[in-house]
């Protein structure tokens, strides 16, 4: 049984009265892709690595090799410590963790690509922050990770999850949808709400370009992880209120794939357009080449 659409996934879950992670594990077992044991083992290892990346990133101000980043997480932590934020403690944690992991990535630390290295801070920051503040067990976090993986897997059947093919909508955008679905599940949302949250997250980042300054996964990638982690929470919040996307999730994925085809190659990880060709970016590139 190969699951290729969100509609098919929802129908199977409802028919069998199963959760998304249960259906996807069964599907992979039947197809010979993986056993339930190995799926959960891989998710457990990923969760361990994600926590390590957070803990390391929170303590470090070491600059990246380029010198363009490395202290964003520390600055945010310092500002949150002044108790002037509009965000709740959990939202503060989500933003901070997203930056911590993303900065670990540019320091060449160990991260989990979920679905890509450039979007590595979004899924773990949302899952782990919510889990820590709401007594969510490790098993439930693993279930959430498997659900997030299922979401990414279905999207990837229509559009490769790479900035060079689909722009950043296919990286940070899909990561945000994965995080939103995982969060909605942890909050007790039903299958329809989970899939709706995916659609809500995706349709509001359509056309997001991949235009890395100096061709490095730093500017705007690191800060974008923090923004789209909060975007995931917004999608979950709307879905939990039963605010339904008028465009079905599968059609949104189709629109994303079409948008990727229409997008100029200059805006798909080439560093030849968008932010990468601003005056300041060109100057940074020039200075970098002189080092």
Please report, for each region that a protein language model flagged, where it lies by residue.
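Conserved active-site and cofactor/substrate-binding residues in soluble primary-metabolism enzymes
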Residues: 37-49, 63, 89, 93-96, ...
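Glycine- and acidic-residue-rich phosphate-binding/metal-coordinating active-site segment common to enzymes
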Residues: 145, 151-164, 169-178
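Alpha-helical support elements that line or immediately flank enzyme active sites
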Residues: 124-135, 183-188
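Acidic-glycine-rich active-site phosphate/pyrophosphate-binding loop
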Residues: 88-105, 140-159, 204-212, 267
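Functionally critical mobile loop/hinge segments
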Residues: 181, 185-291
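Conserved phosphate/anionic-ligand binding catalytic regions in large, soluble enzymes, centered on
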Residues: 108-126, 170-175
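Glycine- and small hydrophobic-enriched segments that form the cores of compact globular domains
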Residues: 86, 113-120, 132, 136-137, ...
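Generic N-terminal targeting/processing segments that precede catalytic cores or assembly contacts
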Residues: 1-109, 133, 242, 249-291
